[in-house]
Regions:
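Short gly/pro/ser/thr-enriched loop/turn and capping motifs at secondary-structure boundaries
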Residues: 42-45, 99-101, 113, 217, ...
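Active-site cofactor/cluster-binding pocket
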Residues: 1-203, 207
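Peripheral docking tails and interdomain loops at the edges
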Residues: 13, 110-122, 127-150, 313-314, ...
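Flexible, low-complexity linker and terminal segments
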Residues: 190-193, 333, 338-565
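Thiamine diphosphate
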Residues: 2-66, 70-83, 207, 214-311, ...
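Gly-rich Lys/Arg/Thr-decorated short loops/hinges at beta-loop-alpha junctions or inter-strand turns
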Residues: 171-185, 200-205, 223-230, 286-288, ...
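A short helix->loop->beta-strand "cap" motif at the edges of active sites that frequently abuts
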Residues: 86-92, 103, 232, 281, ...
């Protein structure tokens, strides 16, 4: 068995939980290993009970796990909640009162050493120094990583705090969790939302707008930070309605455009989504799901908006709905969304969720492919005109996709309307024209379906059990499948990257080969199971649901599947 160490840092908002977790993650990469970090945080600015878990392995990590090997509790009041998750013989560190009884917890003087380092807020760095010693990470490595984060006097204080923590740990902390030396390989440290933003930029996004809404806000941060040097214009709008209308306007003018939001913001965008459908204007909407309804649980995870994304907006119009299942897929599918939205002149929805949004991994730079962007703007002789020389923005074509010119093309007036319209873009109430235009738009479904991303199948190509999921359940299903295989229960994992148009034929062919089919979903009603039934006519055997706001973990999922079989 290879390396598998799970470090969990806990504390209130403002105690530096995220900073410590991020530094420990980079320490693992610097030592030549891989990590998968997940965050669990409350919807408050200060206080609360937050955690940052870093799972370190000697091979790429696909999911977090429930049990911790090292627990660093920056607030000892959190120990009763987190202690049960520590696997024996785990190391538990916290700043206990002097009169606290001895037990499973190693009392570490985090506060005293933080003050000695120059600031009482440096307890997280003292604890990081202790963890570095437990993992066998050289202090010069930690110093180098700190220099990437801090400057001047505060850098020296952080370095001193780490040294004091590591010095205290000498002789007090067991070496059971030391990471063996491994060859360093350059890696990119990315969250799901950071990868999604980079994929959109690589896909040619030149305009982005949004109104902050957790867990989609960090997509906007990534776009606004990394996009402008590459020609992207970013606008923080007054609300989600304005954001999507701005993006549609930018797309009409020829810029690839996107927005990012969560469920409540997407609800406000529904009318503009229909506008994009009627105008046949390409636009990408990143929908970062969280538990609802209404405000729901802003900082928790869920997959409750699958059906909403597939049917939002009034009227009937084609759309593409993609669901990345990993940080790497967040990048590649964001690129794909930009390309497909313009190729088919449809809105494209990228479904992610808080779990994937905030998951951080070390990604292989070569796996994040940068390809040439293929623009599909009609120019010159490509612009269709009627007998009077007018541009036919909505020219009827066999595949439903009309040559798209943009304002500024010489001799061309680009007419677009939210009313039903004819080929020239001017509104109409002619029943015959209405039928032709509805059928024209609908023909895009065939093109989208022909280019549908097929389900990804791993494990036995046929047999007794298939586990089906979409989006962020990909990694946890894959690891749960491996746990079941070791226990003598062979199962296949089926991951859907595209849910609309649904890859019905491919999915039906796969599911026909298995006796028991279970969907794994972070919602109560089995929305994926309903979608499979509607699109293939197949009734799945059951649904493993979790809707408490927390993600599945591999061991828990494998246990529940065993109970179902």
């Amino acid at each position: 068995m290879g390396i598998d160490v799970n470090i969990r840092i806990t504390g209130g908002a403002g105690q530096g939980v995220h900073t410590a977790g991020g530094l420990i993650s980079r320490m693992a990469v610097a030592a030549g290993h891989h990590f998968h970090a997940t965050q669990d945080y409350m919807s408050r600015i200060r206080g609360g009970r937050n955690s940052y878990s870093v799972r370190v392995m000697d091979s790429p990590v696909r999911a977090g796990r429930a049990g911790a090997d090292i627990l660093l509790a920056l607030d000892p009041a959190h120990l009763p909640h987190f202690l049960p998750s520590v696997d024996p013989p785990g190391l538990v560190l916290s700043d206990l009162p002097a009169d606290a009884p001895a037990g499973r917890v190693t009392s570490a003087p985090l506060s005293r050493l933080a003050v000695s380092a120059g600031s009482p807020i440096l307890g997280n760095m003292v604890g990081t120094g202790i963890v570095a010693r437990a993992l066998g990470i050289p202090l010069d490595t930690v110093d180098r990583l700190l220099a990437l984060e801090f400057r001047d006097d505060f850098l020296e204080k952080n370095r001193q705090a780490v040294r004091l923590g590591a010095g205290w740990a000498e002789g007090r902390v067991p070496g059971a969790f030391r990471l063996p030396p491994a060859e360093f390989r350059p890696r990119l440290i990315l969250s799901g939302n950071e990868a999604l933003a980079l994929g959109a930029i690589a896909g040619g996004c030149k305009f982005a707008a949004g109104y902050p809404m957790t867990p989609g806000s960090s997509i906007l941060l990534g776009l606004s930070a990394d996009g402008p040097p590459l020609g992207l214009v970013f606008e923080q709008a007054e609300d989600e309605i304005a954001a999507l209308n701005m993006a549609i306007g930018a797309s009409y003018a020829g810029a690839r455009a996107m927005v990012a939001t969560s469920g409540g913001g997407f609800a406000l965008m529904a009318e503009a989504l229909s506008l994009a459908g009627m105008m046949e204007t390409p636009v990408v909407i990143a929908l970062a799901m969280r538990p609802g309804p209404a405000t729901g649980m802003p900082t928790r995870t869920g997959q409750e908006d699958l059906s909403f994304a597939l049917s939002a907006g009034h009227g009937e119009f084609p759309r593409l709905v993609l669901a990345p299942g990993s940080v790497e897929e967040a990048y590649s599918l964001a690129f794909h969304a930009m390309e497909m939205a313009e190729a088919h002149q449809v809105p494209c929805i990228l479904l992610t969720d808080q779990h994937l949004a905030d998951t951080v991994v070390d990604a292989d730079p070569e796996g994040l492919e940068v390809r040439p962007v293929r623009r599909r703007i009609a120019r010159g002789a490509e612009v269709p005109r009627d007998g009077e020389g007018r541009y036919l923005r909505y020219a009827v074509t066999p595949d439903g996709v009309s040559p798209m010119a943009v304002p500024g093309e010489p001799g061309v007036t680009v007419v677009a309307d939210s009313d039903e319209h004819g080929e020239d873009g001017h509104l109409t109430e002619d029943p015959g024209v209405r039928i032709r235009m509805v059928e024209k738009r609908a023909r895009k479904e065939k093109g989208l379906a022909a280019e549908a991303l097929p389900p990804l199948l791993s494990g036995p190509p046929d047999g007794e059990v298939a586990l089906v999921g979409f989006g962020s359940t990909k990694g946890v299903i894959a690891e749960a499948r491996e746990i079941l295989a070791r226990e003598g229960v062979p199962a296949a994992a089926v991951h859907l990257r595209q849910v609309g148009p649904f890859p019905s034929g491919a999915m039906d062919g796969i599911l026909a080969r298995y006796g028991t089919v279970l969907t794994v979903e972070n919602n109560r009603t089995g929305q994926l199971a309903r979608l499979i039934r509607a699109e293939t006519g197949r009734e799945v055997s059951g649904t493993v649901s979790r809707f408490d706001g927390l993600p599945f973990t591999p061991g828990e999922l494998a246990r529940e599947i065993r109970e179902r079989l």
